[in-house]
Structure formats: C-alpha cells, structure tokens
Amino acid sequence: MSKNIDDIKNEDGKKVKIIKLKKKVVKIVTYNDLSVKNDSNSFVDLHNNSNKAEYSQSRDNRTGGYSQNRDNRAGGYSQNRDNRAGGYSQNRDNRTGGYSQNRDNRTGGYSQNRDNRTGGYSQNRDNRGGYSQGRDNRTGGYSQSRDNRTGGYSQNRDNRTGGYSQNRDNRTGGYSQNRDNRTGGYSQNRDSLSFQYQGSVKKTYVAKNNSQNKYTTTSMSFRRLIKTKVPAIVSSTPAADSENSKELNRKLGEKKKQQQESQKSYKRKKAETESKTIEQKVFEQLQKKKRENLANPIPKSIDIMGSITVSDLARKMNLKSSDLIAKLMALGVMVTINEKIDSDTATILVEEYGSKVNVVSIYDETVIEEEVEDQSKRVEKPPVITIMGHVDHGKTKLLSVLQNIDINQTESGGITQHIGAYTIVYNDREITFLDTPGHEAFTMMRSRGAQVTDIVVLVVSAIDGVMPQTIEAINHAKEANVPIIVAINKIDLPDSNPDKIKHQLSEYGLVSEDWGGDTIFVMISALKNIGISELLDMILLQSDMMLLKANPSKRAIGKVLDAKIDLGRGIVCSVIIEDGTLYVGDSFVGGACYGKVKALISEKGVSVKSVGPAKAISVLGFSSMPQAGDPFQVTKTEKEAKLISSKRQDLKKYESSKNVKKVTMLNLYDSIKEGALKELKIILKADVQGSVEALKNSLEKLTNDEVRVRVVHSSAGVITETDISFASASDAIVIGFHVRPTAKAQVLADQEKVEIRKYNVIYDAINDVRSVLEGMLEPDVEQQFIGFAEVRAVINVPKIGVIAGCYVSRGLIKRDAITNVMRDGLQIHSGKISSLKRFKDDVKEVAEQYECGIMIDNYANIKEGDIIEAFEVKKVKKSFKT
C-alpha cells in the first residue's frame, strides 16, 4: 500500500511515523496509553476531499501547518487549540504551560506528570515505574509486555505467538500488524479499536483522548468507523496459534476448491446444453409438460352454469385454451377463445378428458360461507307441514278447521291462490302449516312448498279420487325426498270410497300400512271435524321419528315463499326460516337482492323482534323484489350482502343474454316463420310475486302456430303510469290480478286508449286471454258446392272477351262464385265468375233450369260441352288449440 516510510521518530513519549500513501501523506502517532475512548467523538476527520492534502494535514477549510490547526484557529508549532495561547508546551484548557506540559493544575516537568503523580522520564503511570512503560502491575521491559505475559520485541498480546509482525487474535502476521482479519499498517492501533489502510484511503481520523488531550491519526478503509472489542485476558500458547493458522489455511483452501468445482460444474452443464440434439430438447420439454400435468391434474368434475367461454373452461380444467380449441375443431365445432359454448357442448368436450360437468345455478356459484356450527346447540324444532292436493279437495277447509277460521272467505272464487303459512299449537307443541294452491297454474308454488317442508299431507277426495294435481303433488314430494301422510277427505259423504283411493294411490307407490306398506293413511272429514286429532297425532309421531333439529344460535337460513309490494310499507316478503334465528337489523341476501331487516310481522299481523327455526314471517327491508323460491340467508355484514347481491345480478344478466338467439342459416327459416306469428302483448301486474309467476307461466302456454302470448313486462304491485306508457308504446294490453290502477294511471290509460283488464280469479284471466287469441286467428276458408252449368254455346265479343252460353242443370250459379272448368272429366281451369247475365241484364244469381251468360275472369279457352262447377267460399271461425 505505502510507497515508502519517510520518517520514524519519537516525540515526547510517542512514536510518530510519516507514511506516503500514493498522493497522500499520513502522520501516525502511537500512544502507550490504551485509554482512548471508543466513541465517535474521539475521532476527527483529517482528510477533506474538497481541499488539497498538504504535509500540514489541514482540515475543515482551515489553513494548515505543521501545528495541526483545527476549528478555524491560527496555528503554530505549539499545536494551539481551543482559542488558547500556545507555545511549545502544548498548553490546553486555559492553563499556563511550559515545557513540562503541565495539565489539570498539576506541577509539571519534563516527565509529563499527570493525575498528581510524581513523574520521570520513564512516563510512569498508575504507580508503576521503569523505562519499560509497565502497566497494570505487570513486569516491564523493552518488549512492552502486557497482561501478565512474557514480552519480547514482538509485542505479543492475547495468547498469540509473537514475532516482528506483531500478530494478534490468531491471525497470520506480517510487518503490517494485521488485526481482526484486516490488512494492517505500521500504525499499532490499540485501545480495542481496529483501523487499517485497506484499499484506498477514504478518510483519516485522529483519536482524541479526553483524559490526556492528545491526538493520534489513523486511517480507515470505509466511510463508517469499525470498532472491535478485544478481550481483556486471553491465555495463549505458540502451539495453539500455529494450529489455528493451519485450520484457517485449511478452510481457505477448501473454499477455494469448492469455487473451482462450482466453476467446472457450470462449464460442464453449459457444454452439455449446447451439445444436446433437437430430439433431446423436445423429449425434455415433453417430460417437463408431463410433470406440470401431474402437478395440476384435470379435475374429475367441474361446475358450470348454462354456458361458459372456452377460456373459463380451460382455466377450470387446468388446460390451455389452445388445447380445447383444437379438440373442438376435431369435433367439428369452430370457436374462438372468448366464444361461449353451451352446457351440452362443454359436457361432450370435458368427457373427452375423462371428466364430467355439473350444471349449477347462480346460487351455487355465489355460496355464502356458513359459520362453524356447534352441534351441541342443536335442539328440537317444530315440524313444517305442507298441505297439497287437487283443487276443491278440501285442503284449505282442513287448515280452516285447524285454525278455527274460515280462510276461504279471504280468497276470491273460493280457491287458494297464494301460498299461506300458519302456526298452531297442539298438545303444547308447535306445528307450522303451509297451504299451497291446487289449481294447475300454481305448479311452482306447490314445488316450493315441497322443497321447504318436512312432511307433506296429501289431501285426496274420497269422491273424486286421484286427479292430475294429486299426481303432481306426489311427484314434487318424491323429488324433494319428503315423507307423505295421506288424508282421505269427505268420508262423511255417502258416495265416498276410501278403498278405491288406496288402490289408486298404490299405483304411485303410496301403499297403506294396513295393506303392508309404510305410508300413513288417515280418514278425515274437514267439514264434520272427523279424524282431525288423529291426523295431528300422526304428524307429531312422524316428526319424532325424523328427529327434526335446528340451531337457534346461528345466522338465519330460509326460503322466500312469496313477495309483494304493500302501499306504505314497500316490499314485503313471506319467508320460512329453516335454521337459525332472524333478528331485526340483520343484513341478508334474498336471491339476487340484499337488504336489512326493518321489521318482522307474524301471520297474525303482530310485530316481533326475532323469529326462530320452522317459522314463517313477513320481512320488511328488501332493496328490490326477489323471486318466489329464492334462497334467503343472513350475512355477517351489509357490505358482504351487497357484494354477493351484485355478483348474482351480474350472473343473471349473463344468463339472460345467452338466451338471445343468433340468426344463422340454420334457423333463418324458423325466424321468418316466427315473425309471421301474431302476438298478443301483455303487461302483467299482480299482488304478489307468486301470482305473477303462476299467471305468466299459464298465459305463455297459450301459443300455437298462428298466435301466441308475449308478456313484455310483469311485476308485483299496483298498475302505475309507467305501466300504461309502456303498454301504449308496445301496443299491449294491461292485465291486473288482484290489483287496480292508480287514479293517474287510469286517466292516462283513457287518453292513450290502453285497455286494462282486471281479474280476481286466475282461471277467469286465462279464459279471457284464450278468447282474445281465438279472435286473432285467421278463419278457415271452406268451398261449398252450389251448382253447375253446361256450356252450350261460345260467343266471342270483340273488346270484351269470350262469353259462355250456359244452361244451369243443377243448383244455382252466383256472381263472384269460384268455378272449376271441367272437360272430359278433368279440371282444366279454376277461376272466378267476373260477369253473370241473363239476356242483357246483369244478375246476382241464376236458378236451376235457366239459361245464362257466364264470363270467367282472365279465361278465353272455353269450349262447347265443358261443365262449369260453381262453389261458394265461406269463412269458418277457428277454435284456439294449443
């Protein structure tokens, strides 16, 4: 590092070395005292890059000299500091100096006496004497031995083998006084602080001892100060130091050997990679792909909705979109990556990979995470019973008897048109009953009733027996895997035949217990109150066998039975709670709608704060109108409810958009034919969502090849001005079921000539619409034979045409009649009579056995002997058939 050592000398008990480091000069002062503090304030930067380094080591933008001037003070040989008058005595701290370097009010001398100690040339400190600079009760000598160790010229320290190199801390030494694995210099750094000249010198620091007011310069290789504590007492032997040196050399050799091996391995792999053939690279890529496939296998089954894009299907199957597109091309289907394929195509495609497809609904795609349930909190719950059966078989009358009220008084036409929920108490136990409509239009209502119930009570008339809606109710119950109790009603009538009913039901798998089956049959008469108690006992017995339980402490889960708009209260939904407890203030999701419970109204019209499992309740607080049958579930927060609702609405829009047909060459003819259909456009309004759904489905079934019903809009609530405006724009009629128009809507309807039809009974609405459709049908055209005439003469009149002189041999001939010209028993022409005359007079008809002149429109090739048959066209009104 250093070019040469310019000077080595002693100045006042300290060794001074001047070393040239390339273009810089460093003055190194070594003290015998090791009490320099190990803090950053003990070091002063002697080098400043902004100033040129001179022999004077000037710093801090000050003019330098040999005096090592600092802090913008005038320098001199006296090393003046801190605004004090200097001299050779190195005066400090406002004290009068002399050659003796007197400090701290102590009598000085050449001996540099400090701390009230008697001095001498030997620089004796801490009651220790001798030229050897002895310290800490240690025997001194020229070797400057320390820490009870035998000294020598090598200045051995801390269990280290000495030599001229002044080796320390088990490190191989040299003239540089190496310490702490750092490259040293001649500076003899002590006081538990290690400095070195390693690399280029960045800064030079001066160690400042506050107790002696002396300085020493040293150099650092880094911009931060590195402090290393040296153990105070460490035993050392030359043999141990030698072993440590060998161990260090061995480790360095091993490390170098490892580096060489690593370089050789890298070069070898690089050479192997460059020498690989194309076949080897392809093989490795295939192996890599195989490993990736093993890491991401194709699932055994995937869930999709009605349709899915190729990219989404590829993601679900852990495949590349290009692979699926290629497979579809092989199957004869041309698609792009973002094109949708239907569930059938997706099923065929997925089966090619040995997997299967499950078609799910939007609710399966947006499952709300349920809370962890404590099974110990599940308790017995009341049974939910759905009463089902054919219309007029006595379902509602039975429920009236159970509640001791006449429910049919509140239903138009004496039939149930809404799904009702009621709770009764029998033998101190609660039972919840659901009454479903029996009319064929309310199929979906009956289906929902079967899905939310625990037991189905099938009411069958002992007179009528099994009817279409009876069979439908059986199928709904079996599909929902719900047990059935058969109640044979009207046994009080003389024509009742229960055995016939048992035989009919056995054909559908319902075999009575007394016939060896497992279905409970109860004979009742709702009108005479016969067998009601026995029926209730059987219901409770069946529920006990089923071990019905629920957890009232969890968040509520249920189903929307029906929904309506109530003036003054907004949207009111009838909800059956299947599990958990619903409280006022709960946030929830109902289908694609969200909300927060504002109020809970029981079936008796009483406001309650909460409702438990197996109870029906009216809920206020929906943000929009849900669909009947939608799932109902309470969420943790309102934010979660809004998020799920938004996602479900997007999925519903997506499902609706996929139903839009694309016009292709394959379905173009069907589209043209469909455009020729006559449509009856209807805007449908009803009191509850369930009635809207039932009536809409019934009306849309009224379709044939010529006419059809198109419900352009349907919703629950009163008829508003918006409905009238929509009807006027779309040329539709408005049907209100159990609702009336507002006053303003009625005025607007009169102005716009919009027809409003109001109904209270569902089959009245259906029959009226059927009659309207019949009036829209084109009548059938029938040709009725009225007579024929023989051509006896042919008269050609210029500018008029050919006139056939005829004799009416049978029936009569009428003007404008349709004729068939027959010659030799073959029809040669069919046309209309344009002129009929008797002599010169135009007549409307000519009777039998009279002569007349007949001119046929646009026909002149008539000959004598031809027979003219006359037909009258009649239009016959068609009857509507679906």
From Swiss-Prot:
Q: Which UniProt keywords apply?
A: Cytoplasm, GTP-binding, Initiation factor, Nucleotide-binding, Protein biosynthesis
User: Region G3: what ranges?
Assistant: 435-438
Q: Where is this region: G4?
A: 489-492
Task performed by this protein: One of the essential components for the initiation of protein synthesis. Protects formylmethionyl-tRNA from spontaneous hydrolysis and promotes its binding to the 30S ribosomal subunits. Also involved in the hydrolysis of GTP during the formation of the 70S ribosomal complex.
- Specify the protein name: Translation initiation factor IF-2
Q: Where is the composition biased (Polar residues)?
A: 38-56, 97-124, 140-192
Subcellular location, record wording: Cytoplasm
Residues forming the tr-type G domain are 380-553
| Gene name linked to the record | infB
Mind listing the GO molecular function terms for this protein? GTP binding; GTPase activity; translation initiation factor activity
